[in-house]
Amino acid sequence: MELRHLRYFVAVVEEQSFTKAADKLCIAQPPLSRQIQNLEEELGIQLLERGSRPVKTTPEGHFFYQYAIKLLSNVDQMVSMTKRIASVEKTIRIGFVGSLLFGLLPRIIHLYRQAHPNLRIELYEMGTKAQTEALKEGRIDAGFGRLKISDPAIKRTLLRNERLMVAVHASHPLNQMKDKGVHLNDLIDEKILLYPSSPKPNFSTHVMNIFSDHGLEPTKINEVREVQLALGLVAAGEGISLVPASTQSIQLFNLSYVPLLDPDAITPIYIAVRNMEESTYIYSLYETIRQIYAYEGFTEPPNW
């Protein structure tokens, strides 16, 4: 059995047609049919239902297909990573969600640059979902995000959980609780500004899920493009917003931050890399994160 047999079989299953699969693979249909027959004979198992239109897998064929696509994906990743390692220019590409710039990420990147003065570091702002695809396609090497998106090709590690705060106008009644804090059910009747508006899932999805977990359903929800816009509107008296605690570094006239007391009112911070990633630069990035976290006094630094 060779990799081409797996690629031929996967193409037939996905196209549900020998003719379309042959066109996709740029080979004639008769040789393709013979290769599939040879594969079945080698396995001693019928993988495709005979005479079905469109082409369908047998139960055994479906099982074989699931593992074939995983194996081919790993092979493609191996080839991509090998070519990247062989590249003359050493570059690491890092994706991040914008709100992390108000926390520890700038310090992590700065210390990492100091540790690797000859390494080219490229930064790309993108959502967690986009980071997942960019990692799989080799467009970035690491991603910092706030959502846990499961993907067998990606290793995602929780760095820490960050508390959520309520951003309010200084004249808002909730600001009277600035020293004590408020709960989610205190916000249910407020006009809430969430961000970003797209693509989903995103931070606004996470916030709405927290409300839902408490059996709460805010009805006055406005979604805006980014955190800076949300906070600017809050400062203008247009509503309130739920933001990570690190966002308090954004200070605007008449903008105030009130603690949110619910234990699960948190937003996680993850780092994501490819599952087979073994670059020394990635391990060095881990070590840089450990140093910053230790300096900040986090009791349980990430353990890779």
UniProtKB/Swiss-Prot annotation:
Binding residues for benzoate 1: S99
Binding region for DNA: 18-37
Binding locations of cis,cis-muconate: S99, T128, F203
Binding site for benzoate 2: L104, F144, R160, N202, Y293
Keywords from the UniProt entry: Activator, Aromatic hydrocarbons catabolism, DNA-binding, Transcription, Transcription regulation
One Gene Ontology term of the molecular function aspect: DNA-binding transcription factor activity
One example of a Gene Ontology biological process annotation: catabolic process
GO cellular component: protein-DNA complex
A Pfam family it matches: LysR_substrate
HTH lysR-type domain sequence ranges: 1-58
Transmembrane segments: none
Domain of life: Bacteria
Family: Belongs to the LysR transcriptional regulatory family.
Function recorded in the entry: Positive regulator of the ben and cat genes for benzoate degradation. BenM is necessary for ben gene expression but not for expression of the cat genes, which can be regulated by CatM. Binds to the inducers cis,cis-muconate and benzoate.
NCBIfam families: benzoate_BenM
Description of its domains: Contains a secondary binding site for benzoate in addition to a primary effector binding site that can accommodate either cis,cis-muconate or benzoate. The existence of this secondary binding site may explain the synergistic effects of cis,cis-muconate and benzoate.
Assembly, per entry: Homotetramer; dimer of dimers. The dimers can also associate to form linear, higher oligomers (in vitro).
Official protein name in the record: HTH-type transcriptional regulator BenM
Organism of this sequence: Acinetobacter baylyi (strain ATCC 33305 / BD413 / ADP1)
